[in-house]
Curated annotation (Swiss-Prot):
Gene: pdhD
Complex and partners: Homodimer.
Binding site for FAD: 32-40, 49, 113, 303, 311
Name of the protein: Dihydrolipoyl dehydrogenase
Source organism of this protein record: Mycoplasma pneumoniae (strain ATCC 29342 / M129 / Subtype 1)
PROSITE patterns, per database record: PYRIDINE_REDOX_1
Cofactor: FAD
Function statement: Lipoamide dehydrogenase is a component of the alpha-ketoacid dehydrogenase complexes.
One annotated GO molecular function: flavin adenine dinucleotide binding
Protein family per UniProt: Belongs to the class-I pyridine nucleotide-disulfide oxidoreductase family.
Record's subcellular location: Cytoplasm
Gene Ontology cellular-component terms listed: cytosol; membrane
């Protein structure tokens, strides 16, 4: 059967592409091998945030006395009920994704796709022809290939982020290999739920892609939960539930009921292996600025192109690819610099634009201003004063170069700054805006007002 568009993958990039294609009357086929909604909805963003919210409530209950509330009796955790709630949330949202695809009048087929040529896709022995192909196949966890890890994984001791969402119970001891975003979120989750957590990080600090103030504060917050962080730890091997590492020439080891390996993700592009696509020196498929491969009617979007593995970045890329197929200019390409990133710890971390570290490395002139949450009335009222808002500006124009926020509502606050950066707004624009009071959000305008006095007199 002939289609205008075949979309391989029904995750964030894929289903949004299908929705946009449907609005423009393209005859569309969506191929999905496992999860409608992709990793994000089924075994990523949504289920982790569901569990992290419950973990945050546990934190509040354990510290109820700090809020003048006495609880008689023990705070008990019902893990099975938490998993059941997680499943209901996922099921509801998967239904929503299926409804979006159906309302776009896109056809669907289940199975693993293989692109045979620029216009033909094979699924479960059947072939489908199309004018354009959008590959939105997502990514998968990267595994350690060091000695003993394959056996430990086979024996159920070594797990990935997908398995960490459906354990039979809260592990008494959890080892997290990798101190990036995913590893840190799981460390917060399980430490709040009662696990004894140890993080093995290969470099000198956790969250190394963020500025040092972020790493330092998050490390302190983890330590209040009795999380042990071992930095400069080069993992060497595993023996079932024991991980061995080298640190400053000395060998050490740590034992856990489960060992969560969180060292990044690999794009799923095997469906394109039969094509002679242009690749770079690292064997990655080369794309142009419009997300086209060297075969122009084949696009790769979302995690599958590994440009920025975030669902909201994938949404925009999915829309943009279809927009480009239609030869329209309604959708702007996704820009890394104005795409916010968040860590759903307690408090949350969010950033957009350059980090101060990147500005220094690239020699970009900047001025910075920051305020701690201890100056914010709402934060004091909420008894949540751990955190800060830091912003960097162009010293000549006042344009926003970057921002980092640690606050209970950081993931909601950062959207304002992503919009401001994308629109080219300046420190003057935000300083002259009126924020509701009392809110944590007014810290953004307060930082800009302080910056005017500090740097733009």
């Amino acid at each position: 059967m002939n289609y205008d568009l075949i979309i391989i993958g029904a995750g964030p990039a894929g289903y949004v592409a299908a929705e946009y294609a449907g609005k423009h009357k393209l005859k569309t086929l969506v191929v999905e091998k496992e999860y409608f909604g992709g990793v994000c909805l089924n075994v990523g963003c949504i289920p982790t945030k569901t569990l992290l919210k419950r973990a945050k409530i546990v934190d509040y209950l354990r510290h109820a006395q700090d809020y003048g509330i006495s609880i008689n009796g023990q705070v008990a955790l019902n893990w099975n009920q938490l998993l059941e709630q997680k499943g209901k949330v996922v099921s509801k949202l998967v239904g929503g994704v299926k409804a979006i695809i159906a309302s776009a009048k896109a056809e669907t087929v289940m199975g693993e796709a293989k692109v045979l040529d620029p216009n033909t896709v094979e699924v479960a022995g059947k072939t489908y022809t199309t004018k354009s192909i959008v590959v939105a196949t997502g990514s998968r966890p990267r595994y350690l290939t060091l000695p003993g890890f394959a056996e430990a994984r086979q024996n159920g001791f070594v797990i990935d982020s997908t398995q960490a969402l459906s354990l039979e119970g809260v592990p008494r001891k959890l080892v997290v290999v990798g101190g990036g975003v995913i590893g840190i979120e799981f460390a917060f989750l399980y430490a709040s739920l009662g696990s004894e957590v140890t993080i093995l990080q290969g470099v000198d600090r956790i969250l190394e892609i963020f500025d040092t103030e972020v790493s330092d504060l998050v490390a302190k917050l983890l330590q209040t939960k009795n999380v042990k962080i071992i930095t400069n730890a080069q993992v060497t091997r595993a023996n079932n539930n024991e991980v061995f590492y080298s640190q400053n020439g000395q060998e050490g080891s740590v034992v856990g009921d489960r060992i969560l390996v969180s060292i990044g993700r690999i794009p799923n592009t095997e469906c394109l292996d039969g094509l002679n696509l242009q690749r770079d020196e690292r064997n990655r498929i080369v794309l142009n600025q419009d997300l086209q491969t060297s075969i122009p009617n084949i696009y790769i979007v979302g995690d599958a192109n590994a440009q920025l593995m975030l669902a909201h970045f994938a949404y925009q890329q999915g829309r943009y690819a279809v927009n480009h197929i239609l030869n329209k200019k309604q959708v702007k390409p996704a820009q890394k610099l104005t795409c916010p990133s968040c860590i759903y710890t307690n408090p949350e971390v969010a950033s957009v634009g350059y980090t101060e570290m990147e500005l220094k490395k690239q020699g970009i002139p900047y001025v910075k201003t920051n305020l701690v949450l201890a100056h914010c009335g709402k934060a004091i009222a909420d008894n949540e004063t751990n955190g800060f808002v830091k912003m960097m500006f162009d010293p000549q124009t006042g344009k926003i170069l970057g921002c980092c926020i640690i606050a209970a509502t950081a993931s909601d606050m950062i959207a304002e700054l992503a919009l401001a950066m994308g629109a080219g707004l300046t420190v003057f624009d935000i300083a002259n805006s009126i924020s509701p009071h009392p809110t944590i959000n007014e810290m953004i305008a307060d930082v800009c007002k302080k910056a005017l006095f500090d740097h733009f007199k």
